[in-house]
């Protein structure tokens, strides 16, 4: 796959940032590293899982960790990984704040910021901004936390079906979407409505044929299990982090916890992990295709 960015550092309409997006297992980081080497860039990770410390195998982190959220991949610096403990929460608004700071730092060095990842809402928030969302309400949260995950899903399904379906297996996001809906009377998507761009950017998204994508995700899931993801999960639990913490709610980790609790076999673990990863990758593919101002690269 050949990738041409049509990017010229001497262009009078110089871009502030480059964005490389796409579904999981599509080769985003590889392309970002190639571009950074050619155009003197640094990567800003846009991945809601790679922000967590101690979880490397299951989030497919690459390169060598240096310090303070900084990694080096084949000589290229990557920012905004390993910045939170597994029990800390993160949001699109927080990502925008952190990414804005890194973009400014990279531009001051005369380099190109290359935002790379598959967390679509973070990318959209960075490029177009967020509509004002209500802050967390302690009283409401206390009430919502008494409900089961299925109950949260059922209630949200009536008022914001898109957010309910998208986050049905993530209790933290279900709770937040319901909280936002109750406090504002609006859906999550309405809060992510398009605005004027915040940056002069070039957005390139890798689109992969579903058959190829399914094969790649299946191979990746099997490789992660064989490479120590089960042991990685157990290590985090042994450190005292709760099995329901933010980081362990992600695909793969929650399946491994079921396996460790002897609720499913290792064979079922791999099957369920692979299936949910395939579905997630397909949703990512669909989401990026629906976004404005994107140039696509096809497998």
From Swiss-Prot:
NCBIfam families reported for this sequence: miaA (TIGR00174)
Highest classification ranks of the organism: Bacteria, Pseudomonadati, Elusimicrobiota, Endomicrobiia, Endomicrobiales
Cofactor section: Mg(2+)
Free-text function comment from the UniProt entry: Catalyzes the transfer of a dimethylallyl group onto the adenine at position 37 in tRNAs that read codons beginning with uridine, leading to the formation of N6-(dimethylallyl)adenosine (i(6)A).
Region of interest (Interaction with substrate tRNA), ranges: 47-50, 172-176
Gene name for this UniProt entry: miaA
Record carries keyword Ligase: no
Family under the similarity heading: Belongs to the IPP transferase family.
Name of the protein in question: tRNA dimethylallyltransferase
Classification via InterPro entries: Dimethylallyltransferase, IPT, P-loop_NTPase
A molecular function GO annotation: ATP binding
Keywords per UniProt: ATP-binding, Magnesium, Nucleotide-binding, Transferase, tRNA processing
GO biological process, one term: tRNA modification
Pfam families given in the database record: IPPT
TM ranges: none
């Amino acid at each position: 796959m050949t990738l041409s960015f049509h990017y010229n550092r001497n262009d009078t309409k110089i871009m502030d940032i480059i964005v490389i997006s796409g579904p999981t297992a599509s080769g985003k980081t590889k392309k970002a590293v190639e571009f950074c080497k050619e155009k003197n860039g640094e990567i800003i990770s846009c991945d809601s899982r790679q922000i967590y410390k101690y979880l490397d195998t299951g989030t497919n982190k690459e390169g060598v960790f240096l310090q303070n959220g900084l990694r080096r991949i084949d000589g290229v610096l990557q920012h905004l990984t390993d910045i939170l403990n597994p029990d800390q929460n993160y949001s699109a608004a927080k990502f925008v704040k952190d990414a804005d700071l890194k973009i400014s730092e990279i531009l001051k060095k005369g380099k190109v910021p290359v935002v790379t990842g598959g967390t679509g809402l973070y990318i959209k928030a960075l490029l177009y901004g967020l509509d004002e969302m209500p802050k967390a309400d302690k009283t409401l949260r206390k009430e919502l936390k008494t409900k089961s995950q299925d109950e949260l899903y059922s209630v949200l399904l009536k008022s914001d079906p898109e957010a309910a379906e998208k986050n049905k297996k993530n209790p933290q996001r279900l709770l937040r979407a319901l909280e936002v809906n109750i406090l504002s009377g609006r859906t999550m998507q309405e809060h992510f409505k398009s605005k004027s761009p915040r940056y002069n950017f070039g957005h390139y998204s890798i689109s992969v044929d579903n058959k190829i994508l399914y094969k790649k995700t299946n191979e990746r899931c099997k490789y992660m299990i064989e490479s120590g993801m089960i042991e990685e999960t157990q290590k985090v639990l042994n450190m005292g982090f709760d099995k329901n913490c933010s980081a362990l709610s992600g695909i793969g980790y929650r399946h491994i916890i079921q396996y460790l609790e002897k609720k499913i076999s290792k064979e079922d673990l791999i099957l369920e992990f692979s299936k949910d990863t395939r579905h997630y990758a397909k949703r990512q593919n669909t989401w990026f295709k629906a976004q404005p101002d994107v140039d696509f690269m096809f497998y």
